[in-house]
């Protein structure tokens, strides 16, 4: 697991591509997910992109998503709730390949879901990267500022 930590601002280009910060690319290159050699994930590696219920996008390395995918695959297609969860999870997921400049294409559907049209904030969150439209992230942070101590006290 890469251990992504930090916050960076980047812009979506006119073709809907997002530049993955170099320090994050180095992390997953060090972990073997993006070694520049041809693989099942393309020449320069790949990431799984997931729409989230809070309006952000989460980016996962294939090695991290593999464990989550196994858990989802283990759900029964004959149990209506488990089948629904599978459908909902895979409906909001795409795998994208990095190009040689370290960019990933984001579909119009995913950009619209996250309210992204230009600049983004990319948060390193240990095993994933979280992509936010800056004003949306600011709203979440400002709206939750008084809850940090209580949440940290409850879970740590």
From Swiss-Prot:
NCBIfam families: PRK00326.2-2 (NF001476). Forms oligomers. Keywords: Cytoplasm, DNA-binding, Repeat, Transcription, Transcription regulation. It comes from Chlorobium phaeovibrioides (strain DSM 265 / 1930). This is Transcriptional regulator MraZ. Gene3D superfamilies: Transcriptional regulator MraZ domain. Residues 7-64, 93-136 form the SpoVT-AbrB domain. It holds the Pfam family MraZ. It is found in: Cytoplasm, Nucleoid. CDD domains: MraZ_C, MraZ_N. The keyword Ribosomal protein does not apply.
């Amino acid at each position: 697991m890469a251990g992504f930590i930090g916050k960076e601002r980047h812009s979506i280009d006119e073709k809907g591509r997002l530049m993955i910060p170099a320090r994050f690319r180095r992390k997953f290159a060090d972990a073997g997910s993006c070694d520049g050699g041809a693989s099942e994930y393309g020449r320069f590696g790949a990431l799984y992109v997931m729409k989230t219920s809070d309006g952000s996008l989460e980016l996962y390395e294939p090695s991290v998503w593999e464990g989550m995918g196994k858990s989802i695959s283990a759900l029964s297609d004959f149990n209506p709730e488990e089948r629904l969860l599978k459908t909902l999870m895979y409906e909001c997921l795409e795998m994208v390949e990095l190009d040689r400049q370290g960019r990933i294409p984001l579909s119009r559907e995913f950009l619209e879901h996250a309210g992204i049209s230009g600049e983004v904030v990319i948060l390193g969150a240990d095993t994933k990267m979280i992509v936010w439209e800056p004003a949306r992230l600011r709203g979440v942070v400002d709206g939750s500022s008084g809850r940090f101590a209580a949440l940290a006290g409850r879970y740590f």
